């Protein structure tokens, strides 16, 4: 699988080393950064963790959690990407991943977690066959049972006719702030971004500690099964966030540019590295900008 993804040329996978996960004496690892909610490369400050439902805290940081844990919360149609209106024109589209609103477009400290559980497909289909028969026998007592039985049959027909893989899926957004006013703002912003995806925002309070604990890197085995929903693999991967922040080029020379999203300076090689990766075939430059935009600095 790793070779297939890497050979595509679009994205690359790399297995993390043990020191990158657990850290060293000089640098914190991924687990330590997650438990302190800090991405600093310096040694993280030890902080108390309060796991009380409704008011979970890590040090001075108060956490809020929004989840996508039910098919009722999802839009009627999922896609791999969407048109970003701000950077699109009538002649060109700027395409971002479907979950971009809760990724880089969410302007606050947050973690977007995506879970896809690949269980035994045959057992899932057998369980749904049994549930379908039970709901059919109870359909005379409630119309909702008849509707659910019809939906289950549609799911089973899709699985058998197209041979798609049934999976369990869950997504959540953990955001945090240190003061009450900022906390209310990020809670509203997260809900608004989920609504932009045409999802129903579900603000969780009671199960925040459980889902935070399950989100520790390598600890997905503690994830509560009742927080996931059944779907197919194709629909589940539509909820992945495919964007990342700009990163400095590994080249020893380049130009300092500003990250368009956050204004952070980034070291960029605009000549050798793009040619090495096959993005460009020559080093010609064309600079376009109004008067006073800094063209002469190039």
Indicate where each model-derived feature is located:
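Extended, folded cores of ATP/NTP-driven motor/assembly subunits in large transport
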Residues: 1-244
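Glycine-rich phosphate-binding loop of nucleotide-binding enzymes
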Residues: 252-298
